[in-house]
């Protein structure tokens, strides 16, 4: 049974809303905290790291809660709605820190940022957990996932292109007010897009659709054991963490790089927004690319193209030649690579859910995607921490002309660090990841045979008692 266009577009629009709401945090929150609120880079970097350590605990717990959920609306939809509404409120508060001062301000920043991460987890885990429940077919997943990734990328590029102009226009001399008002626009898109997704996207091959609910009674300890027993999930965790650290260093530091190293913050939109077209074209043609090439080749491209992007920026620095065309080329290389990565990662997590059911006899969509959410936020936090540490070491001072040492350190942050982490991702994939070719086909044939014996109705899951005992061991 093929997936309808209504399902694909509705799922895609939901991704647009949620990534529109999170993009401002990944791209501009550190800038807002340091250059608008006036917090030290050390405080901000430490906060981001502590929050992500908490997420390492909180995300699997949320995955466990979602896994145990049974309702008339399905396993995932109630949490998507609850998380969207809660995260919308916290997002507005997150960009209200400029209204406070002193100790009150620091406490407010810490509390709201940690709550932001928790509430985003509530909706993000079940949102992506829908992928393996919509279809088991490999090709259908490769055709479905580009839709949410396309709209998510579109949201990111819109955020990069319009945030600062909106903030400057609405806020004028008060950038804090401009950021605060922009969050209201994001929240409106967030809520409307979520409602559309909830109405038109349905669970079919969920663990809800098996004859018993044994899987919903797994203990938290057993759930954590699932993560470590699933070797392919552990491999993906390492790859995705390295990739997210690299890409978040670039996106999080780009505003600093263009402001101080290149010396013209107005060139920043050229780097991200103009490259958006290449990113979106990549997503549109992904099904054809993966069919004519292979996932292995596309993963290599996802890792190598951003390194070439860093090379272009390095060449510009060495030549002291800041050319718009070269900036656009660097942005295109980066965004084509990240487009391939995000589609492949979502598909790979769905495959890993199948692999977990095949190997451990337990299907836990929300657990696998809780790890994905943890890694995405962890990559953002580690990137911010690395940026903060290096900025502190090189003597960075906001809103002034930087020293030669500081400019050299900024080159290290923007070019050397991401290159290192992209290479780690590439090595891990070719050394340890195995869900390709015949292995993947064998798993999916096994599961299709299994589900043909069970009508795809919203009845409870059949998890063998022996399998649960094995996981708990």
UniProtKB/Swiss-Prot annotation:
Belongs to the sodium:galactoside symporter (TC 2.A.2) family. The chain crosses the membrane at residues 17-37, 40-60, 78-98, 106-126, 151-171, 184-204, 233-253, 267-287, 297-317, 326-346, 379-399, 408-428. PANTHER family: MAJOR FACILITATOR SUPERFAMILY DOMAIN-CONTAINING PROTEIN, MELIBIOSE PERMEASE. This is Melibiose permease. It holds the Pfam family MFS_2. Changing residue 59 to C: Loses ability to catalyze Na(+) or H(+)-coupled melibiose transport against a concentration gradient. Does not bind Na(+). Binds melibiose in the presence of H(+). Monomer and homodimer. It comes from the Bacteria. Mediates the transport of melibiose and other galactosides by a symport mechanism. Can use sodium, lithium and protons as coupling cations, depending on the sugar substrate and the cationic environment. Alpha-galactosides (melibiose, raffinose, p-nitrophenyl-alpha-galactoside or methyl-alpha-galactoside) are cotransported with either Na(+) or H(+), whereas beta-galactosides (lactose, L-arabinose-beta-D-galactoside, D-fructose-beta-D-galactoside, methyl-beta-galactoside or p-nitrophenyl-beta-galactoside) are cotransported with Na(+) or Li(+) but not H(+). The lineage of its organism: Bacteria, Pseudomonadati, Pseudomonadota, Gammaproteobacteria, Enterobacterales. It catalyses: melibiose(in) + Na(+)(in) = melibiose(out) + Na(+)(out); melibiose(in) + Li(+)(in) = melibiose(out) + Li(+)(out); melibiose(in) + H(+)(in) = melibiose(out) + H(+)(out). The keyword Transport applies.
